[in-house]
């Protein structure tokens, strides 16, 4: 077992609970009745990013749903990676097509089944955990910034204005897009 596998094995219960805590939030951007869920999901992401070791994690207003921004600056002269992801999900209907509740994660045949487990909470969660591993093991050589939006599933109507307004904050050498 290599060092990464050991880290995952040692932390698996907490890793799974943290991921499931995100998936359980029905952050459906297309439905206005989920406005509070959108904020709850953004706040949960900020908390998880802080726990992973970022210097700051902010839930920032936009013209629509909040945007989560976080960063870890290891060296002002180092290159910066900006990780983009989204925390909103599509509606789960029709519910009768689900074999389990869409916002109650279930493991079947080694896979997590739930709305958002893949697109995009699962993918972005893996990026954050990789960052955490690198940081905790003294392997992080680049600055890392995260931007997680809450409107990708409805066309990202607020993202362009947010990026324009905060272009200095979001400045990076490379962007890693975490989305299917």
Name every feature range the model reports, one short phrase each.
Residues 17, 52, 139-142, 170:
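Structured loop/turn residues at beta-strand edges in well-structured enzyme cores
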Residues 46, 125-132, 160-163:
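Predominant activation on well-ordered alpha-helical scaffold segments within soluble catalytic domains
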Residues 78-148:
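Active-site metal-coordination/substrate-binding segment of hydrolases
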Residues 42, 120-124, 156:
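Short alpha-helical patches at coil-to-helix transitions and adjacent helical residues
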Residues 141-180:
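Histidine/acidic-residue-rich, glycine-tolerant segments that coordinate divalent metal ions
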Residues 2-95:
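N-terminal helical capping/dimerization or prosegment-like subdomains
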Residues 10, 51, 136-137, 164-168:
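Secondary-structure boundary motif
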Residues 34, 94, 123, 158-159:
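Residues at alpha-helix caps and immediate loop-helix transition turns in enzyme cores, especially N-
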